[in-house]
């Protein structure tokens, strides 16, 4: 376990990295700039993160909150729970601001591309589990490709945040999930209960 002072330095470096990413993009993040902004020695940054990319990766992943995967017995309730959580935490909002910057930089930098893939994998994990549970319950077809199902569910939110650069409101969440759930459950292997 890291010592308290070490933990404080770690947090200060990650916070400074996120601030720099938001202000200057990936190209604006240097170990020198993070050291100056955070008050953490460059040697400490190298010891904790090994490289600029390691620092960016840790900062981006730090914005991904691990949400417990719900299992309410209802695809609709599980998705509403997750998307409610995704859109209402500060770290999640920061992540949605960071992702377009990282995606743009990923076109030119394979290490940044790996970071983006890692962040998306973390974000998709609980959604994939919820969809798998829905398949097991017969709410959606067992033959439905889960990557396609994820695209149906996540696509509108990604478009809203990254292309339109608009906030994801509760009304938007409800409208999208109503449509996505209707589409997904239309593939069901069993008749859906009413109510």
Features from the language model and the residues they span:
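Basic, helix-initiating cap at the start of DNA-binding domains
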Residues: 1-37, 54
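Short amphipathic alpha-helical segment with a characteristic S/N-K-E followed by hydrophobic residues
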Residues: 13, 28, 51-56, 66-67, ...
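Short hydrophobic/aromatic patch on the recognition helix
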Residues: 38-49
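Amphipathic alpha-helical segments used for helix-helix packing
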Residues: 59-60, 90-117
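Hydrophobic alpha-helical connector segments
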Residues: 67-97
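C-terminal peripheral helix-coil segments that are non-catalytic and often amphipathic
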Residues: 81, 125, 129-136, 163-195
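Amphipathic alpha-helical packing segments from all-alpha helical-bundle domains
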Residues: 93, 110-137, 147
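Hydrophobic alpha-helical segments that form the core
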Residues: 141-163, 173-180
């Amino acid at each position: 376990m890291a010592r308290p002072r070490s933990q404080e330095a770690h947090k200060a470096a990650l916070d400074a990295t996120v601030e720099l990413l938001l202000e200057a993009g990936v190209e604006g993040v240097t170990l020198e700039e993070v050291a100056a902004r955070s008050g953490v020695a460059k040697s400490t940054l190298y010891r904790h993160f090994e490289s600029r990319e390691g620092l960016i990766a840790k900062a981006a992943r730090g914005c991904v909150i691990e949400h417990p995967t719900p299992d309410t017995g209802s695809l609709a309730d599980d998705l509403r729970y997750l998307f409610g959580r995704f859109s209402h935490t500060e770290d999640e909002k920061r992540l949605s601001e960071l992702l377009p910057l990282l995606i743009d930089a990923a076109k030119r930098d394979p290490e940044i591309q790996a970071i983006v893939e890692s962040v998306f994998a973390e974000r998709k994990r609980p959604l994939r589990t919820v969809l798998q549970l829905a398949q097991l319950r017969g709410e959606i077809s067992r033959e439905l490709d889960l990557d396609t199902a994820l695209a149906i569910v996540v696509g509108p939110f990604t478009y809203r945040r990254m292309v339109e650069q608009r906030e994801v409101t509760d009304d938007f969440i409800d409208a999208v999930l109503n449509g996505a759930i209707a589409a997904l459950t239309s593939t069901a292997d069993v008749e859906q209960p009413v109510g």
